[in-house]
Protein backbone atom coordinates (compact mmCIF):
# COMPACT_ATOMS: atom_id res chain seq x y z
CA UNK A 1 0.00 0.00 0.00
CA UNK A 2 1.24 3.46 -0.90
CA UNK A 3 1.32 6.10 1.84
CA UNK A 4 1.70 9.79 1.10
CA UNK A 5 3.18 12.14 3.66
CA UNK A 6 1.21 15.23 4.65
CA UNK A 7 3.53 17.29 2.45
CA UNK A 8 2.98 14.99 -0.54
CA UNK A 9 -0.78 15.08 -0.02
CA UNK A 10 -0.64 18.88 -0.01
CA UNK A 11 1.41 18.88 -3.24
CA UNK A 12 -1.08 16.65 -5.07
CA UNK A 13 -4.16 18.46 -3.75
CA UNK A 14 -2.68 21.84 -4.68
CA UNK A 15 -1.92 20.75 -8.24
CA UNK A 16 -5.27 19.00 -8.59
CA UNK A 17 -7.11 22.20 -7.69
CA UNK A 18 -5.88 23.55 -11.05
CA UNK A 19 -6.71 20.45 -13.10
CA UNK A 20 -9.45 20.60 -15.71
CA UNK A 21 -10.63 16.99 -15.51
CA UNK A 22 -12.16 17.10 -18.99
CA UNK A 23 -8.99 18.29 -20.71
CA UNK A 24 -6.47 16.28 -18.70
CA UNK A 25 -8.63 13.14 -18.51
CA UNK A 26 -9.39 13.18 -22.20
CA UNK A 27 -5.74 13.57 -23.12
CA UNK A 28 -4.56 10.91 -20.66
CA UNK A 29 -7.05 8.26 -21.82
CA UNK A 30 -6.47 9.17 -25.46
CA UNK A 31 -2.72 8.81 -25.04
CA UNK A 32 -3.20 5.45 -23.30
CA UNK A 33 -5.19 4.17 -26.28
CA UNK A 34 -2.65 5.49 -28.80
CA UNK A 35 0.57 4.51 -27.01
CA UNK A 36 -0.71 1.12 -25.85
CA UNK A 37 -3.08 0.10 -28.67
CA UNK A 38 -3.95 -3.25 -27.08
CA UNK A 39 -5.93 -1.29 -24.47
CA UNK A 40 -8.36 -0.31 -27.23
CA UNK A 41 -10.05 -3.71 -26.99
CA UNK A 42 -11.93 -2.46 -23.91
CA UNK A 43 -13.25 0.51 -25.87
CA UNK A 44 -14.21 -0.97 -29.25
CA UNK A 45 -17.79 0.22 -28.70
CA UNK A 46 -16.52 3.82 -28.62
CA UNK A 47 -16.49 4.04 -32.42
CA UNK A 48 -13.56 5.19 -34.55
CA UNK A 49 -10.24 4.40 -32.88
CA UNK A 50 -8.38 3.91 -36.17
CA UNK A 51 -5.84 6.73 -35.85
CA UNK A 52 -4.30 8.85 -33.13
CA UNK A 53 -6.28 11.85 -34.37
CA UNK A 54 -9.55 9.89 -34.36
CA UNK A 55 -8.88 8.70 -30.81
CA UNK A 56 -7.96 12.11 -29.45
CA UNK A 57 -11.07 13.70 -31.02
CA UNK A 58 -13.46 10.86 -30.16
CA UNK A 59 -16.22 12.29 -27.92
CA UNK A 60 -16.70 8.98 -26.09
CA UNK A 61 -12.98 8.79 -25.30
CA UNK A 62 -13.12 12.38 -24.08
CA UNK A 63 -16.17 11.75 -21.90
CA UNK A 64 -14.76 8.57 -20.40
CA UNK A 65 -11.40 10.25 -19.80
CA UNK A 66 -13.18 12.95 -17.82
CA UNK A 67 -15.06 10.29 -15.84
CA UNK A 68 -11.82 8.44 -15.06
CA UNK A 69 -10.09 11.61 -13.94
CA UNK A 70 -13.08 12.53 -11.82
CA UNK A 71 -12.59 9.20 -10.02
CA UNK A 72 -8.94 10.06 -9.47
CA UNK A 73 -10.09 13.39 -8.03
CA UNK A 74 -12.46 11.53 -5.71
CA UNK A 75 -9.46 9.50 -4.57
CA UNK A 76 -7.91 12.68 -3.22
CA UNK A 77 -10.73 12.83 -0.69
CA UNK A 78 -9.86 9.34 0.54
CA UNK A 79 -6.08 9.11 0.37
CA UNK A 80 -5.95 7.00 3.51
CA UNK A 81 -8.55 4.51 2.24
CA UNK A 82 -8.12 4.17 -1.52
CA UNK A 83 -8.76 0.42 -1.47
CA UNK A 84 -12.05 0.81 0.35
CA UNK A 85 -13.09 3.75 -1.78
CA UNK A 86 -12.44 1.92 -5.04
CA UNK A 87 -13.42 -1.62 -4.02
CA UNK A 88 -16.51 -1.62 -6.24
CA UNK A 89 -14.64 -0.17 -9.20
CA UNK A 90 -11.91 -2.76 -8.72
CA UNK A 91 -14.51 -5.52 -8.66
CA UNK A 92 -16.18 -4.17 -11.82
CA UNK A 93 -12.89 -3.97 -13.73
CA UNK A 94 -11.81 -7.42 -12.53
CA UNK A 95 -14.98 -9.52 -12.61
CA UNK A 96 -17.05 -7.93 -15.36
CA UNK A 97 -14.72 -6.00 -17.65
CA UNK A 98 -11.65 -8.26 -17.24
CA UNK A 99 -9.24 -5.34 -17.53
CA UNK A 100 -5.58 -6.23 -17.15
CA UNK A 101 -4.55 -4.51 -13.88
CA UNK A 102 -1.30 -3.41 -15.53
CA UNK A 103 -3.41 -0.92 -17.50
CA UNK A 104 -4.06 1.05 -14.31
CA UNK A 105 -0.32 1.55 -13.82
CA UNK A 106 0.11 2.53 -17.47
CA UNK A 107 -2.70 5.08 -17.22
CA UNK A 108 -1.22 6.52 -14.03
CA UNK A 109 2.17 6.98 -15.64
CA UNK A 110 0.60 8.63 -18.68
CA UNK A 111 -1.39 10.91 -16.39
CA UNK A 112 1.86 12.09 -14.78
CA UNK A 113 3.28 12.88 -18.24
CA UNK A 114 0.13 14.83 -19.17
CA UNK A 115 0.22 16.78 -15.91
CA UNK A 116 3.89 17.63 -16.49
CA UNK A 117 3.09 18.77 -20.02
CA UNK A 118 0.28 21.05 -18.87
CA UNK A 119 1.79 22.44 -15.67
CA UNK A 120 5.43 22.80 -16.71
CA UNK A 121 7.39 24.78 -14.13
CA UNK A 122 4.77 24.13 -11.45
CA UNK A 123 5.42 20.42 -11.90
CA UNK A 124 8.54 20.30 -9.74
CA UNK A 125 10.41 17.16 -8.72
CA UNK A 126 8.52 17.17 -5.44
CA UNK A 127 5.16 17.44 -7.20
CA UNK A 128 6.13 14.68 -9.62
CA UNK A 129 7.21 12.39 -6.78
CA UNK A 130 3.95 13.01 -4.94
CA UNK A 131 1.89 12.46 -8.10
CA UNK A 132 3.74 9.22 -8.88
CA UNK A 133 2.93 7.94 -5.41
CA UNK A 134 -0.69 9.00 -5.78
CA UNK A 135 -1.20 7.27 -9.15
CA UNK A 136 0.60 4.18 -7.82
CA UNK A 137 -1.84 4.15 -4.91
CA UNK A 138 -4.76 4.49 -7.30
CA UNK A 139 -3.43 1.66 -9.48
CA UNK A 140 -2.98 -0.56 -6.42
CA UNK A 141 -6.50 0.22 -5.21
CA UNK A 142 -8.04 -0.51 -8.60
CA UNK A 143 -6.06 -3.75 -8.91
CA UNK A 144 -6.86 -4.85 -5.34
CA UNK A 145 -9.67 -7.24 -6.35
CA UNK A 146 -7.22 -9.12 -8.58
CA UNK A 147 -5.06 -10.19 -5.63
UniProtKB/Swiss-Prot annotation:
Keywords linked to the UniProt accession: Heme, Iron, Metal-binding, Oxygen transport, Transport
Taxonomic superkingdom: Eukaryota
Signal sequence annotation: none
Biological process annotations from GO: hydrogen peroxide catabolic process
Pfam families attached to this UniProt entry: Globin
Binding site residues for heme b: 64, 93
GO MF, one annotated term: peroxidase activity
Family matches, as PROSITE patterns: GLOBIN
Stored InterPro entries: Globin, Globin-like_sf, Globin/Proto, Hemoglobin_b, Hemoglobin_oxygen_transport
Span of domain Globin: 3-147
GO cellular component: blood microparticle; haptoglobin-hemoglobin complex; hemoglobin complex
UniProt note on tissues of expression: Red blood cells.
Keyword Transport: yes
CDD domains, per database record: Hb-beta-like
Family the UniProt entry places it in: Belongs to the globin family.
Subunit comment: Heterotetramer of two delta chains and two alpha chains.
Name assigned to this protein: Hemoglobin subunit deltaH
Protein's organism: Heterohyrax brucei (Yellow-spotted hyrax)
Lineage of the species this protein comes from: Eukaryota, Metazoa, Chordata, Craniata, Vertebrata
